[in-house]
Amino acid sequence: MNDLKFTTCGDYVNDQQTIQRIGFACKYMHPDQTQKKKILEEIQRPLNTRSTTVQWLNRQTREVAEQRLWDIMVHNIQAYYNLIEYVGSLPNELRMVRLGSDVLPVYTQRDWSYFWQLPDVRNYCATHFARVGTLARSLDVRLSMHPGQFTVLASDNPDIVDRSIEEFEYHTDVIRYMGYGRQFQDFKCNVHISGRQGPAGIKATLKRLSPEARNTITIENDENKWGIADSLELADDLALVLDVHH
């Protein structure tokens, strides 16, 4: 199975049987990578998200920049849909995918975060992300997200914790739009323990997260400092993810 990047596996209970699933991460790659680059791009583009940069946006007029963000939003939400539709066509044990984090670019960036709160934008997201969530549930595709390495919920720097919470809640907004976060672990949003305060810092930060964020957060052992034993200190507070490579 080379058409999606391999990421992880997990167990779930179905009809009183434990079934393993193998999942994929973020980016679709066609099985035949020997084709011409242009052909591959045309095949892969509809299933993969696009992005932009603050630097590019800042060089444009407000009208041009907002139109770019709108176009990216429309493309990316549809790309989510297309990717999940593809994963949903695979055998049951392969129906799991980690969604990319850049679906709504510059969401937490100070100069551009306002765009994502505009009524028309919020209405579009609510309507079309809902389609994505409905599709995933109808095809029994398990979904997850993984905020980047700069999301450090256990930092000893209050500013970093504040920004990390903003970033995690951005992911939660996407999750909420898709109709998840209503029940404990109906979606996985995974972060490393990372940060000098370790498990104690995670416990303190949990209290500041929205209910949907607390329902979906999972904590993974870190490759640098906080291992499996440290993760287990959080077992009564949230769900844990074991990374055997760390």
Per-segment meaning from a language model:
Residues 25-27, 98-100, 144-148, 190-192, ...:
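A cross-family glycoside hydrolase active-site/sugar-binding cleft signature
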Residues 1-142, 151-162, 173, 177-180, ...:
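Alpha/beta catalytic barrel-like cores
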Residues 161-165, 186, 193-195, 220:
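Residues lining hydrophobic/aromatic ligand-binding pockets adjacent to catalytic sites
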Residues 92, 184, 236:
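Structured loop/turn residues at beta-strand edges in well-structured enzyme cores
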Residues 165-172, 202-206:
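Hydrophobic, well-ordered secondary-structure segments
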Residues 147-149, 153, 178-196:
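Active-site groove signature of glycoside hydrolases
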Residues 193-246:
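Acidic/histidine-rich catalytic cores of soluble enzymes
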